[in-house]
Regions:
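N-terminal helical submodule of small eukaryotic multi-pass membrane proteins
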Residues: 1-86, 90
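Hydrophobic core of alpha-helical transmembrane segments in multi-pass integral membrane proteins
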Residues: 12-22, 146-153, 178-191
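Central hydrophobic cores of alpha-helical transmembrane segments
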Residues: 137-146
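Non-transmembrane, juxtamembrane loop and terminal tail segments
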Residues: 200-215
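Membrane-interface transmembrane-helix boundary segments in multi-pass integral membrane proteins
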Residues: 2-5, 157-197
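Membrane-lumen (extracellular) interface motif
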Residues: 20-40, 59-68, 88-108, 125-138, ...
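Core segments of transmembrane alpha-helices
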Residues: 76-80, 84, 112-121
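Membrane-interface loop-to-helix entry segments
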Residues: 106-118, 175-179
């Protein structure tokens, strides 16, 4: 994709993510006052940070493909986790996610729990296709899922804020949820690697040509 069109695409994506964030705050704060502890919201915030950083590289006339590669790998896997875990739990038992009678707008729900992953997939496939980029360590996903599980348990015990009460009923359930989250992230990680094995994009070829001429 041409650099100018890439920059415009990134700005549109950022505006969309910010609008979803604002909508989520307006709709969900009365129902979930502490919903910024949820993986869904954390994923949204990290994506916003990523696109702010990547737009900065666009404005500095740098090739976004060569920057923040591990961060993009991480948010791709995290977005995949949010999508699979949410719809999976919703299919199994809606009561594990929502209290009886609670309603979230359908478009907002889909944007939060699938829309962000679709954006990340389009980013890799069409906007900034990365060929054999730098990847996150698989160990990172285990460490982060473990830290997150322990953190929400501590938050519940110290402040009585129940982020995922169904997941904290027993140590066995906590271990299962942590391990499932880890495996889902790893699956997303390898999907990203698979998508990265396609042929090089025009931007990468141009960048490599420039580097060759300079050197």
């Amino acid at each position: 994709m041409p650099k100018k069109l890439t920059s415009i695409s990134h700005i549109i994506i950022l505006l969309f993510l910010i609008s979803i964030c604002i909508w989520d705050r307006i709709v969900n704060i009365p129902k979930f006052p502490f919903n910024f502890f949820y993986v869904t919201q954390l994923n949204l915030y990290i994506n916003i940070i990523y696109y702010l950083l990547i737009i900065k590289t666009d404005l500095n006339n740098l090739n976004p493909i060569l920057h923040y590669q591990r961060l993009f790998n991480f948010i791709f896997s995290l977005s995949f986790l949010v999508t699979i875990m949410f719809w999976g739990m919703l299919f199994i038992d809606k009561g594990t996610l929502y209290k009886k009678g609670l309603h979230i707008p359908f478009i907002l729900n889909c944007s939060l729990h699938g829309g962000v992953f679709i954006i990340n997939a389009c980013e890799q496939l069409f906007i900034c296709k990365r060929k054999n980029p730098k990847y996150c360590s698989v160990n990172l996903y285990f460490i982060i899922t473990l830290i997150y599980t322990v953190s929400i348990k501590l938050i519940q015990e110290l402040f009585n804020i129940k982020t995922y009460p169904f997941a904290l009923k027993s140590i066995k359930i906590m271990i299962f949820v942590n391990f499932t989250g880890f495996l889902t992230c790893v699956l997303g990680h390898y999907i990203y690697i698979f998508l990265s094995k396609s042929k090089k994009s025009n931007n990468e070829e141009e960048e490599e040509l420039v580097e060759t001429v300079i050197n």
